[in-house]
Amino acid sequence: MKKLIISLFAVLGLCGSSCSYLDMSPDLGIQEEDIFTSYNNTWQYFQTVYYREFSGHAAGSTVRYRNIFMAAPMIMDMNENRYSFYVFTDAADTGRKGGLSVKKGSFNTTFQQFFCNDAPKGRPLFQVMFEIIRICNKTIANVDRMADATPEQHDDLLGQAHFIRGFAYFTLCCYFGGMPYMTETLGADDEWDLPRLSAYETFVRCAEDFGTAYEYMKAAGTLRRDGLPGTEGNLTGEGARYPNGVTAKAMQGRALLFAASKLNNRYGESDWRAAAEVCAEAITLAGEWGYSMEPIKNWSKNFTVGPRTNEQLWAMAHLGKSNGKNGRTSCLLAQPQNNHSKGAGTCPTQNYVDKFETKWGDPLETEDDRRAAVAAGHYDDQNPYANRDPRFDLTVVHDGMKVEGSAGSDVINIYRKQDGTYPTSKVSKNNRSFGWPRYTSTTAGHSNTGYYLRKYWDGKYNTSYLQIDPIIRVAELYLNYAEAVNEYAGPQGTAGGLALTALDAVNKVRERAGMPNVQERFTADRDTFRPRIYNERNVELAYEGHHYFRDSRRWRTCEQSMTQKLYGMDIELVGGKKKYTRFELEDARQPTWKPCMYYFPLPADEASKMKNFVNNDYWD
């Protein structure tokens, strides 16, 4: 029987490499009763959404993921091209020039293959997400046939199936827009050539799935799968790999927030109110079940060291190694940090660095902002990294900073000497070159902006450590709530029976970081407060989870951010003193914006398989 079950798992809903993501043929040639009559067999079938991998791929290869974690932003970034999605925005540059074609508005064949090809170097996101959706649909349709499942097992399995289906559709909608939302396994006589829903409709359907998942998990007693803080089992056990009821409610709020956003909004303030109510529920629920923001001294544990904190509602941990034997981290960490000869890295632009306020809460994004901060005695453009938001040093590697792997008086050196050479930096007793002549290589991963990414780096060299993708965490819950409430009720508005105002929610995130409240001049009304909400989100969630890539699109701010000039920071030692000069990046590294760039196009050969499936516009 065991041998039979294994062979059935290999066929039932688990398409091979030749299976199209739109191939919904139900003729699988097996008897389903061999799977769904027992809880153990049904669970073994369903849990492939978490554990399934590509066959024939080398152990340790990130491309082995053929499960829901392929949708995890960090796994998507750990690709053969070594570009994170942040280099497709104004937030970052990359050492390897090839990744900049997307920023220039060219979604070429290479990147189409990256998203859709079932190849060792590909991320066939469409195929895998629709395979997962099919597994969820078959599980939901057959779960009542289990003869030996307890009510808790039955409800938890249904909850997970609804959650994973919603998460798969949410992922597809973020990158490609609205989808046909299939909730049943289609039969031979069913209509499977379905039209696309709008993005608004798709996000609302995702929210419905997340809401259903919450109700089932509540009934199953799986609102949290590990022990509460201070009790045995906290942050331990295999159960944390699976989403729980708190996560489902949080994702329901996020999906409704995306539906309400400017890119998708259909019903005005009522969409925002609906999102705010659920976001309020998520905050309350998270608190009841022991989730809270970590102290700022532990903030980085959300991203490295880990694998778990009580701030993470759901996270994916990946073992990275900062030496030349592991190129997977090179999408985030540039060559001086990981010694991978082709490491591209995510190198923050000066534009994004300017989003980090002074420690007094002064904005620095515009020349007028900086002049005002200088006049207040809060900013010095020749000592630009002093007196900044504490999260700046935890997010960005800049000249003159110390990292954990340095010793004594050792600091990171990015400046240039007057003779044109660059001093090395000592990290874990190794000499590393962070400063480098700009634009000298199209493949080397040295920064052209004067900055490197700190958030996912343990500050050491030649060490193994966990890099963590916090798919959703508590700080985001407050930011989601603040944004939704502000849009229908202003800074002093509330929702969901909470006394917490939109302004309070933002200030709570700032307080954890050691920052003062938002300055009063920015809290008069919805319109003046909105930019500070956006900025707080950009700072707190910087370079994680594709947040900025997604947020700048749903906010429709790309028309401004992707048409501005991008800058770096040049630092030269002159007469024993460092001189800081902003400079424009070369034209080849400047962004372009076209309306079609809100979504990626599907490959024509896939989209054409369905007559009613209208493709997105091509970028080229």
Model-inferred region functions:
Residues 38-44, 51-57, 91-177, 190-204, ...:
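Conserved, well-structured interaction surfaces
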Residues 18-21, 86, 129-132, 207, ...:
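Long, intrinsically disordered, low-complexity segments
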Residues 310, 314-431:
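Glycine-rich, aromatic-lined ligand/substrate-binding cores of catalytic
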Residues 385-509:
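C-terminal substrate/ligand-recognition segments
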Residues 19-76, 383-386, 607-620:
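Membrane-proximal, proline-rich intrinsically disordered regions
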Residues 173-174, 178-180, 221, 258-267, ...:
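Short coil/turn linking the two alpha-helices of tandem helical-hairpin repeats
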